[in-house]
């Protein structure tokens, strides 16, 4: 992409010359992207499937639509006429975005094709493994319980079953024997983001650790697109859902180079500008590709404490064609604050106690409804070393107690 394809100047919000960005998906990650865009003078339109989403609370305008409805999505884009459309979730009518981009009616970040390929696990897995030749775990796809049984038999045990479309680990199961298949099928059906009934079976990799490699495609001073890598982020997942992350994750030099090579190969193919969260499994100097999100990643929330520019600032600047700085300033960690109970109105106790833990900060997302395992906030901690940061982040997160609050 050259300079003619980027935004050459930034207008003034809420005027006729405003530079307008529409976010499709307005959760906690979208909220931080919106804040970063607004600091750069961008007029932001936030869209989500439910009212009062975190990003709705800080945007210039907010809409509630079914984003998988192509007609409704196209109508809203045509109404607002944004300079950029920025998908922040997978469950979007990506075929509509492809049509509109091909017709020259909209610019999608990073590209409509990237949004389409990464909307489910099948598109990106086939691209990485079958087209690009990137190392992945062995896999099969299944549309029925019968096909799932055959897929598990082919892959062997242990294996992992996931819906082809889900988020935050929902619907994932680890299977140790054929006795686990039916429960895994039901779990996937309940946890899928869209009711396709299709799952992926993956061979279980006995990795040492897993990382997110935040990879940024941005315009350089020469007008060409350059790839930048943040320091690797380690993370702990429980049932496929992130509970802690830290930066940097120590890596064998050979493994780090392989991680860079894989991330660049995949993101070069996806194209466009912006930040990508590339998930990888690592065992000594061996690296396997897992997934990629063409947007900020939940494990990357640690960068709000660890980097000169957070992943949200990097994404905002990159998509606008502005310079980026991926430098890390300190080791840091994040720990999730869960809802702990079900309810529509939530209050938080212990925030002051959490902030008394050395080097900590807190982000409460403002979600209007709580579930026991819903991510309602995150504790951040910076320290001289990763272990201290992790301990402090966990300690701070544990001090915050979501409680039911009557209207």
Curated annotation (Swiss-Prot):
GO terms for biological process: 'de novo' IMP biosynthetic process. GO terms for cellular component: cytosol. Keywords: ATP-binding, Ligase, Magnesium, Metal-binding, Nucleotide-binding, Purine biosynthesis. InterPro entries: ATP-grasp (IPR011761), ATP-grasp_carboxylate-amine (IPR003135), ATP_grasp_subdomain_1 (IPR013815), PreATP-grasp_dom_sf (IPR016185), PurT (IPR005862), PurT/PurK_preATP-grasp (IPR054350), PurT_C (IPR048740), Rudment_hybrid_motif (IPR011054). Mg(2+) binds at residues 279, 291. This is Formate-dependent phosphoribosylglycinamide formyltransferase. ATP binds at residues 121, 162, 167-172, 202-205, 210. N(1)-(5-phospho-beta-D-ribosyl)glycinamide binds at residues 28-29, 88, 298, 367, 374-375. Involved in the de novo purine biosynthesis. Catalyzes the transfer of formate to 5-phospho-ribosyl-glycinamide (GAR), producing 5-phospho-ribosyl-N-formylglycinamide (FGAR). Formate is provided by PurU via hydrolysis of 10-formyl-tetrahydrofolate.
């Amino acid at each position: 992409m050259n300079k003619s394809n980027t935004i050459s100047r930034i207008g003034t919000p809420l005027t006729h010359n405003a530079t307008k960005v529409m976010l499709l998906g307005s959760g906690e990650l979208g909220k931080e992207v919106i804040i970063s865009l607004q600091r750069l003078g961008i007029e932001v339109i936030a869209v989500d499937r439910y009212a009062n989403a975190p990003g709705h609370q800080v945007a210039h305008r907010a809409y509630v639509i079914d984003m998988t409805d192509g007609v409704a999505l196209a109508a809203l884009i045509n109404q607002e006429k944004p300079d950029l459309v920025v998908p922040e979730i997978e469950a979007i009518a990506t075929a509509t975005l492809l049509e509109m981009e091909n017709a020259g009616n909209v610019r999608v970040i990073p590209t409509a094709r990237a949004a389409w390929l990464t909307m489910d696990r099948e598109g990106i897995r086939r691209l990485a493994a079958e087209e690009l030749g990137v190392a992945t775990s062995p896999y099969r796809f299944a549309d029925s319980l019968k096909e799932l049984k055959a897929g598990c038999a082919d892959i062997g045990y242990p294996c992992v079953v996931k819906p082809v479309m889900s988020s935050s680990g929902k619907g994932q199961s680890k299977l140790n024997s054929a006795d686990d298949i039916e429960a895994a099928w039901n779990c996937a059906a309940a946890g899928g983001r869209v009711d396709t009934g299709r799952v992926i079976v993956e061979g279980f990799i006995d990795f040492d650790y897993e990382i997110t490699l935040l990879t940024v495609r941005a315009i350089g001073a020469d007008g060409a697109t350059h790839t930048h890598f943040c320091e690797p982020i380690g993370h702990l997942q429980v049932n496929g859902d992130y509970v802690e992350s830290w930066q940097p994750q120590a890596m064998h030099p050979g493994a780090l180079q392989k991680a860079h090579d894989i991330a660049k190969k995949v993101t070069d193919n996806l194209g466009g500008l912006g930040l990508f969260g590339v998930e990888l499994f690592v065992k000594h100097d061996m690296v396997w590709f897992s997934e990629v999100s063409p947007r900020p990643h939940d494990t990357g929330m640690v960068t709000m404490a660890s980097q000169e520019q957070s992943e949200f600032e990097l994404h905002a600047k990159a998509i606008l064609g502005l310079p980026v700085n991926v430098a890390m300033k300190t080791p840091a960690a994040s720990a999730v604050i869960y809802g702990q109970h079900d309810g529509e109105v939530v209050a938080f106790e212990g925030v002051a106690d959490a902030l008394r833990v050395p080097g900590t900060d807190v982000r409460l997302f403002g979600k209007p409804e709580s579930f026991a395992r819903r991510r309602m906030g995150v504790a951040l901690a910076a320290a001289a070393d990763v272990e201290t940061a992790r301990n402090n982040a966990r300690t701070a997160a544990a001090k915050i107690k979501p409680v039911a609050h009557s209207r």
